[in-house]
Amino acid sequence: MILDKLFQLMAEKQASDIFISAGTPIHIKIQGNTMPVNQQTMLPDMIEKIAYELMSPEQTKAFEATMEMNLSFGVPQIGNFRVNIFRQRGSISIVVRFILGNIPQLSALDLPPVLGDLIMEKRGLVLIVGATGSGKSTTIASMLDHRNTNRAGHILTVEDPIEFLFKHKKSIVNQREIGMDTLDWAAALKNAMRQAPDCILIGEIRDREAMAAALAYAQTGHLCLATLH
């Protein structure tokens, strides 16, 4: 698969993104600079083949209904990847985001020490905001792993898609992916309290209902983390 070589290239170059669109070569983004990988112009049928190889039958059906698909997966010895498949001007486009395989420690990210204190709180709402590519996902993963390493309890995440995979350490970590482990955001957030979490991650607050749920979790004695664009 052409993506196998691209994944390897992303890891070697520490690239953040790959862009695959019809009518132009595949582009790679390295340290904020976007450039073509080669001179081969991608055709719609070439991209469609790549997209459908990435999706399961269930994901294919959902994509054909909504024309949008988010998915993630890990490649051994390379890392984790988040993929967005969408339509533009009548053809399929793909954007791949490279996510480091190992969750970095908070101290390695040169972040304010207060983040380590916040993630150990018993209750409250912590919002991580920033532009695309600013490190929101990595920051939250590092915070959650800090709690996982240092406090017993139950951490529940609701994500679309799952980006970092956590190991059970002092805490039990249950990760739910929209479309795979739960029908939709509404169902996952409605049932979260029945799963007795101490700490909840809402992968992204996208609407009023998700924000209301986050506030309700914090007000009922839980620590809730979420991202906002």
Region spans (language model):
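Alpha-helical segments flanking ligand/cofactor-binding loops in enzyme cores
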Residues: 8, 116, 145, 190, ...
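Conserved glycine(s) of the Walker
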Residues: 135
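N-terminal "pre-motor" subdomain/linker immediately upstream of P-loop NTPase catalytic cores
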Residues: 1-129, 139
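Conserved P-loop NTPase nucleotide-binding/switch module
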Residues: 32-35, 161, 193-229
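P-loop NTPase switch/communication element
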Residues: 120, 126, 141-196
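Histidine-centered active-site/metal-ligand motif
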Residues: 19, 27, 146, 154, ...
